[in-house]
């Protein structure tokens, strides 16, 4: 069984099941060249768009029918992006809590991934795009809080995130959710000992940002912010570069090395 489990979570915007496959295929090929075999790594996607997208598309169809909207592609991008960001929050409404529904999906995915790795102490890597980075951060925070409170004793160390050794975020918009607090008050998650966090962003991507400037605490926690050029010729210089990271060489090449280093260090 695999030495390392890798969870891949998508971000804001319209997504489909299988979103991770092109990136996983490219990373698998790159890892093979670095001496990491397919059996060394297990992958598990975290697909949550089915929680938020139906309501968004219902509204879009009604609005387009009644208002004959222009710029449909751009409108869908903005609608799903902002809709995801605004919908993913604790509301106190137990009948319609998108936050908890998404976190339940994350937990189920990690439980599934734990079955594919060699032991409860296997190494975990988390790869997160866009809003997925914010979801990941909140899930880790909530999990660590539960562990501290003596809960989750029935979960493995892997599912309690105690074996987390690497985080890769790209097109991350965590900064957008920090402005309700003073800079000095903004604290990141506590990484387990030995874990590293690297972040990638495209300066043309208005939804992806460096993380170290958020606060002194983030500057200390995040190892590096890397500025790259993501997307193809038609999109790399536009805001649409937000969805261009997945198979872009500027991201997948260093990402493969990041994974290989952790795999080689794994017990």
Where are these regions (language model features)?
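Active-site catalytic motif of lipid deacylating hydrolases and related acyltransferases
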Residues: 12-15, 26-32, 37-120
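Glycine-rich loops and low-complexity Gly/Arg-rich segments
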Residues: 30-34, 67-73, 150-152, 191-195, ...
């Amino acid at each position: 069984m695999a030495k390392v489990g890798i969870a891949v979570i998508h971000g804001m915007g319209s997504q489909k099941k299988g979103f991770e496959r092109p990136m996983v295929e490219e990373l698998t090929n790159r890892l093979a060249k670095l001496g990491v075999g397919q059996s060394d790594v297990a992958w598990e996607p975290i697909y949550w768009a089915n929680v938020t997208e139906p309501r968004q598309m219902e509204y879009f169809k009604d609005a387009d029918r009644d208002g004959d909207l222009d710029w449909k592609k751009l409108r869908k991008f903005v609608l799903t992006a902002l809709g995801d960001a605004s919908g993913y929050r604790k509301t106190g409404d137990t009948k319609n809590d998108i936050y908890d529904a998404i976190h339940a999906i994350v937990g189920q995915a990690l439980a599934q991934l734990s079955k594919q790795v060699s032991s409860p102490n296997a190494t975990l890597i988390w790869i997160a795009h866009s809003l997925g980075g914010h979801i990941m951060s909140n899930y880790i925070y909530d999990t660590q809080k539960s562990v501290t409170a003596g809960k989750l004793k029935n979960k493995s160390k892997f599912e309690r995130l105690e074996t987390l050794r690497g985080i890769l975020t790209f097109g991350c918009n965590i900064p957008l959710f920090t402005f309700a607090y003073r800079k000095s008050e903004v604290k990141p998650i506590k990484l387990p000992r030995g874990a590293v966090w690297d972040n990638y962003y495209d300066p043309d991507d208005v939804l992806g940002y460096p993380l170290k400037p958020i606060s002194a605490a983030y500057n200390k926690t995040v190892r590096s912010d890397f500025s790259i050029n993501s997307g193809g010729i038609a999109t790399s210089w536009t805001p649409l570069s937000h969805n261009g990271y997945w198979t872009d060489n500027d991201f997948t090449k260093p990402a493969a090395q990041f994974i290989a280093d952790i795999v080689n260090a794994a017990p």
